[in-house]
Swiss-Prot record:
Name used for this protein in its record: Pre-mRNA-splicing factor SPF27
A Pfam family reported for this protein in Swiss-Prot or TrEMBL: BCAS2
Coiled-coil regions listed in the entry: 138-222
Localization (cell): Nucleus
Origin organism lineage: Eukaryota, Metazoa, Chordata, Craniata, Vertebrata
Keywords: Coiled coil, mRNA processing, mRNA splicing, Nucleus, Spliceosome
GO cellular component, one term: Prp19 complex
Disulfide bridge map: none
UniProt source species: Danio rerio (Zebrafish)
Membrane-spanning ranges: none
Length: 225
């Protein structure tokens, strides 16, 4: 249950869930849900609250390759197989057997393929030499990150628990104070009722005494005459 909002926009909550009773009573949850539903029906938005924003452009970050791939998927076409042509070493065709340029292109292609394989071998050797330690260091870094995250998580959980305990203590103290004030209010109301009843009784007695005195005065006057 929330009170009125302040100037700063904060909402003052006057519910004491750690102290209040009756939340689990039959029909309470249904009644609360009915109140929420009734309020949402009365305050449904009457216009598009995003109307001040421009129309979203979902293709703003699409590239030509992405668009082609989307079109392929929409057409349910299979993906093109990976071309292995650049790894082939074809000899010049029968019509180019005497063409030096064709043979030079074949030699250049062979040299490129050889260099590519040499680079692959170097990478494998480097991985064999340093890969194990690099992998161990990466695992150690991940373990350290996990440990730090676990510590941070424990700290956050402790802060949440401390906050909940503080909230519970404050609510129980506030509830006890409210109960004391309620008891004092009931006592004061009872005393006021007793005082009012005594006043009414005294007023009745005074009225009776006045009436009796008036009757006696009338009787004395009548006897004098």
């Amino acid at each position: 249950m929330a009170g009125p909002a302040s100037v700063a926009g904060d909402v003052f909550v006057d519910a004491l869930p750690y102290f209040d009773q009756g939340y689990d009573a039959t029909g309470v949850r249904e009644a609360a849900a009915a109140l929420v539903e009734e309020e949402t029906r009365r305050y449904r938005p009457t216009k598009n609250y995003l109307s001040y924003l421009p129309t979203p452009d979902f293709s703003a970050f699409e590239t030509e390759i992405m668009r082609n791939e989307f079109e392929r998927l929409a057409a349910r076409q299979p993906m093109e197989l990976l071309s292995m042509k650049r790894y082939e070493l074809p000899a010049p065709s029968s019509g180019q057997k005497n063409d030096m340029t064709a043979w030079q292109d074949c030699v250049n292609n062979s040299m490129a393929q050889l260099e590519h394989q040499a680079v692959r071998i170097e990478n494998l050797e480097l991985m064999a030499q340093y890969g194990t330690n690099a992998w161990k260091m990466s695992n150690d870094n991940l373990a350290l990150m996990i440990e730090n995250s676990q510590k941070e998580l424990q700290n956050v959980r402790k802060e949440i628990q401390d906050l909940n305990w503080q909230r519970k203590n404050d609510q129980l103290a506030g509830g006890a104070k409210l109960r004391e004030l309620e008891s004092n209010w009931v006592s004061l109301v009872s005393k006021n009722y007793e005082i009012e009843r005594a006043i009414v009784q005294l007023e009745n007695e005074v009225a009776q005494m006045k009436q009796q005195q008036g009757d006696e005065n009338k009787e004395n006057i009548r006897q004098d005459f």
